[in-house]
């Protein structure tokens, strides 16, 4: 499934995203991801949840002294994969996001759109079932934003659920995916194939 989370500033989008990957804990209620109740997860077990997730932020959070390849490989190295498996998978995901020819470059040698592709590659290299995106096109121009959305659609088509918080009306209106509208921390609407303006209907 591909779900957009929209709403005015202060509606709770970022808080919801942070709760999904347990940056914040909900005051009440449950959040179930892959059979894990995130709300009741002990701090020492948060890593178990995060291994099942990929997260893409608006600000790229790339390691500046590592190459494109090394930035993506790092996500597998910390989990103890062997070098042969890492190389195979990293090259696969860099090919998927259109960066196979940029493996030796550093983040400051890339455009904003290319840096975001590296972030996406790093987020999916461990084959997460859920990819959480917090304003992934917020720092990009409209054309580059649509290129990033095509990459996310490809990933979604391969079986990964995507939850994306955004303010970008054009993207939401064009893509006609499920739209969840938040208002002051509450669910205002849930539309199967919606647009940014559906809440006015």
Model-derived segments and spans:
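Helix N-cap at the start of a conserved alpha-helix in ABC-type nucleotide-binding domains
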Residues: 142-144
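A short, proline-enriched helix->beta-strand linker immediately N-terminal to the Walker B motif
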Residues: 125-129
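Catalytic Walker B motif of ABC-type/P-loop ATPase nucleotide-binding domains
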Residues: 131-134
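Helix-to-loop junction immediately C-terminal to a conserved catalytic motif
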Residues: 21
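Conserved ABC transporter NBD signature motif
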Residues: 29-37, 49
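Short coil-to-helix segment of the ABC ATPase nucleotide-binding domain corresponding to the Q-loop/switch region
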Residues: 66-74
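Conserved ABC ATPase signature
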Residues: 105-110, 114-116
């Amino acid at each position: 499934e591909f779900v957009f989370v929209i709403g005015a500033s202060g509606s709770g989008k970022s808080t919801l995203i942070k709760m999904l990957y347990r940056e914040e804990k909900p005051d009440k209620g449950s959040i179930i991801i892959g059979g894990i109740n995130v709300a009741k997860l002990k701090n020492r077990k948060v890593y178990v949840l995060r291994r099942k997730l990929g997260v893409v932020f608006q600000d790229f959070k790339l390691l500046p002294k590592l190459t494109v390849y090394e930035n993506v490989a790092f996500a597998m190295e910390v989990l103890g994969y062997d070098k042969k498996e890492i190389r195979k998978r990293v090259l696969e995901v860099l090919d998927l996001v259109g960066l196979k020819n940029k493996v030796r470059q550093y983040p400051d040698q890339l455009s904003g759109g290319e840096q975001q592709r590296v972030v996406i590659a790093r987020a999916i290299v461990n084959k997460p079932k859920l990819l959480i995106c917090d304003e992934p096109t917020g720092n990009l121009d409209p054309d580059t934003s649509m290129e990033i959305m095509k990459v996310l659609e490809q990933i979604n088509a391969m079986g990964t659920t995507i939850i994306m918080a955004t303010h970008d009306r054009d993207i939401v209106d064009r893509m006609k995916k499920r739209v969840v509208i938040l208002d002051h921390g509450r669910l205002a609407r849930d539309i199967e194939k919606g647009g940014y303006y559906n809440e006015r209907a």
